[in-house]
From Swiss-Prot:
One of its GO terms (cellular component) is extracellular region. Myotropic peptide; increases the frequency of contraction of the heart and stimulates amplitude and tonus of the foregut. It comes from the Eukaryota. The keyword Iron does not apply. It is found in: Secreted. This is Periviscerokinin-1. It comes from Locusta migratoria. Its main location: secreted. Found in the abdominal ganglia and perisympathetic organs. Not detected in the thoracic ganglia, subesophageal ganglion, corpora cardiaca, corpora allata, hypocerebral ganglion or frontal ganglion. The modification Valine amide is found at residue 10. Keywords: Amidation, Neuropeptide, Secreted. One of its GO terms (biological process) is neuropeptide signaling pathway.
Amino acid sequence: AAGLFQFPRV
């Protein structure tokens, strides 16, 4: 699931 990790989790 690359589309899930295109934004950083901070």
